[in-house]
Amino acid sequence: MNVREHASLRLLLCGSVILLPVLAAAARDKPETSSSIIQPAAATRDGQHDFDFEVGSWKTKIERLAHPLTRSTTWIKYEGTTDVRKVWNGRAILLELEADGPTGHFEGLSLRLYNPESHQWSLNFSNSSTGTLGVPTIGEFRNGRGEFFDQETLDGRAIFVRFVISDITADSVRFEQAFSDDGGKTWEVNWIATDTRIRHEYGPSH
């Protein structure tokens, strides 16, 4: 499965090999060489409960760029619901999504796994049509913002993938995916999702 197929899994989920802090810096500041970008470093903060806020049921609105890194300006919209629950006493989070869009109905899932040694999360995605997990993005939360990265190929080109979780409140959250084909100098956002909590289902402490 190539990165476009992997990306399709993410693009249908609201949410992926170790966190690459230098890559994160490149996303904010300037490009780095390939050798510097692949240097790993582990987080030190205990982030086991970072995804507790996400537990519950949500209304989900998704916008997906039709053809990433092609200067495409065509966006496709989806709407659905997302259910999130804890497993492994909070060291893993299981997300299940159902949504509808121009291509019809789909079902997907994300398994978020916490590594107690590196203090980082891996975000693993799949959908019911493939039955396989895509390449995970791995990272952590800092100051209320989650950043997760991986390195893949798209149409024969090496790219970086960045997945950001931000604007977190008790009742809403934003997810954003972007690709870079220039070593992290610039990023093109190709997927945006906003979740709004469904209060009558169950609350964040469930």
Give, region by region, the residue ranges found by the protein language model:
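Hydrophobic small-molecule pocket/channel-lining residues, especially in calycin-type beta-barrels
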Residues: 26-206
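N-terminal secretory signal peptides that target proteins for export/translocation
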Residues: 1-9
